[in-house]
Each structure stands twice: as C-alpha cells, then as structure tokens.
C-alpha cells in the first residue's frame, strides 16, 4: 500500500520547471469543491507537483492535504493567512531551469523541515511535562533546567578516562569557533558562571548571539586584566589576575542556593621563555586551575579547565573526571578541556559521572584523541555528544516509573526496543505526548522499526488519550492551542505522518470530524487496490450490501490497508453522536468548534455517516481476517461500540 505523499505546491513562476520533471503534476483551477480536491489528491501514490489557485483554502486544509509551499517569493496568500513559503528557491536556480538543482534544493530544505515537527511537539510539552525521555540536544536547547528533568540514552562522546578506550573517528561537520563551542556544550543548568581568562569578552558575546536564552539565565563573573566593561547587567567584570581561590570566593554569595560552574582558560604570554620554561609554565597554569576548582568543590557543581598536552612527558597526572576534545579546534592544537565533576549544588543529577580525582594521563593516547577529533572541518557532532553526555541523565524511558507528567519523543521504536511492544504501548498510555515510528518506507538515517498502524490505533486510543499520525497531531495542536503551535509553522507533514503520536487530551466536545481526525487521503484508491489484488477481502461487505445490510467500508479499509493512523474512540463518537444530527446541527457544531474539514458529502448531510451495526460488522470482519495476526484486542472495541 502507498505511504504518505507530499503535494509540492509551486507558484506560477516555477510551473515551467516542474513540467520537465518525472513526478506527477496536478493543475489546480481554484474552482474545485472539497470533495473533488479530496478525490483527486487521493489518486497520487507519490509526491506530486501542484500549481494553480489555492487562495480559497485555509492553511490547515492545505496542510491536511499535504501541501508544502515552494516559491521564489517570500509569501503566498491563502484564505486565512499570508503563508511564509516552506522552500524559498533562489532565483538563479529558477532561471537555470536545472531540474536536479531545483529538486536538490527542495530535498535539502525538507530534511531541515523535519525539525519543525519535533519542535512543535516540544513547545507544547515544555508547558505540560516535567520528565523528557529519549532526549537529545534539541530538548536541552529549550528546556528549563530548574523545572524539567531530561533523560535519555545519548551516544557516548569521545573522552579520555583512565583505563578506557578513547573511541573511533566518525563523520563530522564544521562547528563554531572553539571557545564559543566550549560555552555551547558546557553551559546548561548553571545559574552562575565564574570564567577566568575570559579575554576581551568576544567569546561570551558570540555565545549570547548564538544562544540568547541560555546566556540571559546565567550571572557571569568574568576575570581578566584586559576585559572591558559590559553593558549586559548579568555580566560582572573583574579586572584581576586569579592566583588562588580567595580571588573567586569573595565574589560569591553563599546565602543563595544556585548552581555554579567554574571555567579556567588561563594562558600567559610566552615572552622570552625557552621551550622548557614555556612548557613548565603552561603545565603549572593548568594544574593551578584544577587545584583552585578542587579546593572550591563544595561551591561548584562542575568545572572546565584548560588542558595542554605536554611535549616532554610520556605520562603525567591531573585532577579530572574526563578529558574532552575541543570541537572547532585546529587539527594541530594539542589542547583538551578537563571536565571536573564537583560536589556543589546542581539542578541536574550527574551522579553517573565520577567525582573528579587524580588521574594518570598517557600522552600518546590523548594526542591520538586530538588527531582523531580536532580540525576546522569537524566538531559539530562531537559538540552535540558532549552537550548530551554532560547534561542528560542516562535512563531508559521504557523502564522508568514515575508519577511526573512525561514526554516520550522519538525513541520508543529504536531498534534496541524491538520485542518490547507491550512496554511501548504502556508508555504511550501514560505520556503527555509520545511518538512511535509507523512508516513502511526504507529508513536511511535512523535505526527504527515500524509498529503496524492498525495495531497502534486499536491499542492506543482511550477516553483521555488521542492517537493520531504526526500531521494530525500538529493540525490538532494548531486547532486547540493556536498560541503554542502557530498556523505559519514550517514542517514536513509527509515525514510527520510516518509517526503515530499519542496525546493526553480528551475527545473534543462536540466530537466533530476536524481535519486532524478525518483526512483519509486515498481511501477510495486503497479500497480499489484491495479489490483488484485480493477480491476475497471485500466479499463479506459485498454480500451484506446485497442483503440490504451494511458494513462500514471506511473503517474496514482503514484497518485492512494499514495506511492510516487516526483516533478510533473520537471517530466512533463522531459517527454515533455528531453525524447522527441534522445538517444544520452538524454545521453549527463545526462553526462553534472552529473545526475545519476536507471532505463533505452533501448527500450525507442530513443522514448519519455510518450506523453502530455497520461499525460492529466492520470490526468483526477485520477480526475474522486478521485476528490471529493482530496484536491488539478487537473484542474490547466491539464491547465499547455496543454501549457507546
């Protein structure tokens, strides 16, 4: 059966380019009715180019159809908003009429658009959840460390610890300048940072530009003889040389219970020193930083110390938890960072990291780490791994028990959880929002397995849990929480539809057939495909209709095709309560709810869309055909339908 497709809508100046491509082309006249648009879109099994007039449709209707907006212009006028385009095509690409360049531009942008889906879910969760499971750097970037507990199983970064392997080289990409990268991975939960050797403040000003939220929530004490005054009220400049802990302690208020971070980046001028003198000076400076940090260990949660690798020592000792490579450093910079876990107050439980202690360092091993991971063409993924390793509490969400509101995004169907499907469904039942992969297309970038869509629908829907595909979830949040998920959101709906999303939400009252619930693009085609490939699947339905009885083909094909994820509890309530009303009452409820639809049959406006017995018949037939293979209980739904 076909997987979700995108409608790649191009504005008129690009329509000539798409005609030279190989994807289907859909010309829109602007006079199509709701049903015609629904039927026409349902005939496509691959991504399709479209052009023409869409000004009478709203953004949610077009997103429900899977529209991605592509133009050389900045905006497109729709019925309810002026939409910022999703893919802005450079004019030189449009002029060149190079189809490969055009499609590469779309593809690259769509990869980046995937992030919009996860970000929208997190925006809702940051207001509702306390615990975040399966977390990566994206969650840390926007989490509040004073409120949120961030759990996950992130990949280990390269690091040096006594008696352990360093790791192997992996593909990487360029990142920020090394000192900005340092702040980017070390600053998360600290409320007060004491930064010795800050220089001219350029580094923290660049960090402010890169991450204004994290910069603002820190009180910065910066120490350097040449540091200029700062106009930022949270930056306090101390024009001193730091020689002992006294120079730091006198600037600390111990009546405040805050998390503190100590950064030491001291390097004196070489002046007239020879090689031996210079190496001894550098070695002493780095050890002094460690000693000062260790002596103040009760006041600081952690420290990050400059660590230059000696040229003339095969082995040496330092006080450390881990030695870390420097993302963004030059390939020949034989300098690391020394992370020390200390004993001061912390918002993050870092007990899984060893306390800082005396550690023997083998010079050739740490030089090897420089050679593996340093370089201007590298550092982005190393930095992310360091960020995650230092600030995410290592815990498997599938095994975690807690009464706190929780979020479970993008990890439940990692291949390591295969065989734990009952636990996955239990987590989805408890979570504020959870995601599971249901896509059947090959996965090139992720190591996930797919849950069957029909099983997810039958297992996931409860009176207080909605189960929708990812596009439906975003459309639901746009509808119910427009202040959190904006209509102008850019995301790739076709990518989102590869996920089932559970949301701890009640059934809307009245239970209207909003776009978030009812899209079923291509349902008629799915039915025909079942018939032409295996007509026995339709025999019972055909026979019942000949007898004057009915079976809900809509429900039956939805389950048999495995092509859709929608909320059964809400859908049944919609059919039995809302669709049983008159046309006038139906329209009144839609208007009162501010709901929108993409399918409306005028001939069914005054009639119920299905009746209870036809739904029961469809479930019974699905059980007869698939009951042995179906992992979910169908009998519980039959019982519910009898009493709903």
UniProtKB/Swiss-Prot annotation:
Localization annotation: Virion
Keyword Signal: no
Keywords in alphabetical order: Capsid protein, Outer capsid protein, Virion
Keyword Secreted belongs to the record: no
A Gene Ontology cellular-component term: viral outer capsid
InterPro entries per the UniProt record, alphabetical: Orbi_VP4, Orbi_VP4_C, SAM-dependent_MTases_sf
Pfam families in the record: Orbi_VP4
Alphabetical list of Gene3D superfamilies matching this protein: Orbivirus VP4 core protein, C-terminal domain, Vaccinia Virus protein VP39
UniProt-recorded name of the protein: Core protein VP4
